[in-house]
């Protein structure tokens, strides 16, 4: 779905900008490489430009014009700190493209710090490495971190064709 948002306008939107891709997927790199200054970060993946905890980014504020963060926050125990850090490293007017699974029928995010083992997380969140199911209140968390929010909702047809 991120590719749908980035293309075809994504190259123009990111051209000439300094882009940070958090926990990058190689399939998405083609949408920004060659079109922008492009850096990657992940604390575990090999071959990254940076290795840092997304909740404490050791980069000067305002250092990036765009940040791509695709299906990362549902893995981060302190997602509020991560959102604040992503906002901090963006230049004024910068773009953060953040995707995550949201259960639109739920008003409130479901999370419980006591669900802290891979087995329990698999049972409660459907994945051993997820720490929550987001509800609609994620929009408030994003705004509280300082972002202006634009929700991209693919059409049912796009979901069928690209999911």
Give, region by region, the residue ranges found by the protein language model.
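A short SAM/SAH-binding and catalytic strip from SAM-dependent methyltransferases
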Residues: 66-77
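Class I SAM-dependent methyltransferase SAM/SAH-binding core
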Residues: 14-57
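N-terminal juxtadomain amphipathic helix
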Residues: 1-16
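Active-site micro-motifs of SAM-dependent methyltransferase domains
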Residues: 56, 74, 104
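An acidic- and aromatic-residue-enriched active-site/binding cleft used to recognize and process polar
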Residues: 43, 69, 101-103
